[in-house]
Amino acid sequence: MSGNSIGQNFVVTTFGESHGVALGCIIDGCPPGLELTVEDMQHDLDRRRPGTSRYTTARREADEVRILSGVFEGKTTGTSIGLLIENTDQRSQDYSDIKDTFRPGHADYTYQQKYGMRDYRGGGRSSARETAMRVAAGAVAKKYLKQVHGIEIHGYLAQLGPISADTIDLTQIEQNAFFFPDASKLEALDEYMRGLRKSGDSIGAKITVAATGVPVGLGEPVFDRLDADIAHALMGINAVKGVEIGDGFGVVTQKGSQGRDLMSPQGFASNHAGGVLGGISSGQPVVAHIALKPTSSISVPGQSMTVQGETIDMITKGRHDPCVGIRAVPIAEAMLAIVLMDHLLRHRAQNQDVTSQTPVIGMR
């Protein structure tokens, strides 16, 4: 398995499985001198970790991260940063019944066919448990981005099933278990999720993530465009089936006169492009949306097959999220942060001495 790393100058490599001894990651390329403690990462890990509300999986993991290397006297040294989180609440016996059975909608079948074997305990490497390390690495990037460049990243649950946010109040996001920006919809969300649990089913979601303070110039055309790398990173999150930058698929019904983001020295008139033009950041907020499919592990019976090719009806046992979108908010933030961090370092390496006679467009 070779696809365990992301980035060129800021490189994050993760390892570990859902029911293994531990999860870990190596961060290469973090500049020296950044003040970094466990607490800097723990906040986002606590936002992602399981068992924190009745709307998520009942699996309880402390997700306490340990810094193994790359930090001395509270500051990064410029060497590889090693991070580790131990798994403490595995119940592998919950999965003994599916040892020789493929769960429909999961990676069981494709992993078996590709590698000739699979870790059936909680999905092994394909489990969203792996994303804990992405969040830890993303927290390092988020701190650098904010402290050195003034870039801030915020994500929120924009839609859960049929319920979408009508108003966006960023102050509400951390005040509820849904990371939802519209307080008027919280009661409806709670009622919907309670009904979903009773039915044994699951539901999909849409997440919006945005970065403010991003300077002009990030992105490496043509194949490493900023929006292409953002889409690549976000699409790599478990259960994500769609990514939009800016207006995304909404541009299909737009006319050129509607979606061209008129500009003046004082600022852009709109941000349909999501802060990226020609694969390069424009200085506007970088905005992306992701669609996550409903959890496939549900207690509603469904047809599947065994390793031997026999057809069966099955119910997936274990502890699962009825909506993976709720805990995916900090994951989306982390992946956007990792991409922006990587592109900042790449831009600095090639273009830090570049000057332009054109004034930078302001922010309205």
Swiss-Prot record:
Pathway: Metabolic intermediate biosynthesis; chorismate biosynthesis; chorismate from D-erythrose 4-phosphate and phosphoenolpyruvate: step 7/7. One of its GO terms (cellular component) is cytosol. Reduced FMN (FMNH(2)). GO terms for biological process: amino acid biosynthetic process; aromatic amino acid family biosynthetic process; chorismate biosynthetic process. It catalyses: 5-O-(1-carboxyvinyl)-3-phosphoshikimate = chorismate + phosphate. Pfam families: Chorismate_synt. One of its GO terms (molecular function) is chorismate synthase activity. SUPFAM superfamilies: Chorismate synthase, AroC. Its cofactor is FMNH2. FMN binds at residues 125-127, 238-239, 278, 293-297, 319. CDD domains: Chorismate_synthase. The keyword Metal-binding does not apply. NADP(+) binds at residues 48, 54. Disulfide bonds: none annotated. Keywords: Amino-acid biosynthesis, Aromatic amino acid biosynthesis, FAD, Flavoprotein, FMN, Lyase, NADP. InterPro entries: Chorismate_synth (IPR000453), Chorismate_synth_AroC_sf (IPR035904), Chorismate_synthase_CS (IPR020541). NCBIfam families: aroC (TIGR00033), PRK05382.1 (NF003793). This reaction introduces a second double bond into the aromatic ring system. Belongs to the chorismate synthase family. Homotetramer. This is Chorismate synthase. It comes from Shewanella frigidimarina (strain NCIMB 400). The gene is aroC.
